[in-house]
């Protein structure tokens, strides 16, 4: 599952504002300078502090997140740069970088070295 698929799947699980806000936060992460570890911490904090009213929806949303987290974030060390860009939906951003500094920011987001 990619980050984009995760955001879409979360919206399909529940129509609660909190879940839509989480999906939006996940999408916005792609455009800022925070790395995958920060993403993990923020989403885990969300699930620890925000309750989705229906237990089944909460459980499914957390299972989706856990699957992505375990595969993409915890497995990031075994991925090539292209696999990281794909998993985190960052191909377009990486390809549109106009400077080395912008590229280094993307490398940092996915814990990669140029």
Identify the residue ranges that each predicted region occupies.
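C-terminal-biased regions
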Residues: 1-114
């Amino acid at each position: 599952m990619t980050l984009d698929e995760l955001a879409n799947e979360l919206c399909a699980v529940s129509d609660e504002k909190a879940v839509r806000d989480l999906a939006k936060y996940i999408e916005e992460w792609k455009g800022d300078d925070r790395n995958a570890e920060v993403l993990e911490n923020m989403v885990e904090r969300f699930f620890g502090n925000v309750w989705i009213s229906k237990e089944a929806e909460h459980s499914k949303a957390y299972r989706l997140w856990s699957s992505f987290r375990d595969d993409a974030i915890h497995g990031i060390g075994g991925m090539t740069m292209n696999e990281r860009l794909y998993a985190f939906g960052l191909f377009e951003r990486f390809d549109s970088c106009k400077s080395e500094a912008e590229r280094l920011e993307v490398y940092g987001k996915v814990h990669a070295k140029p």
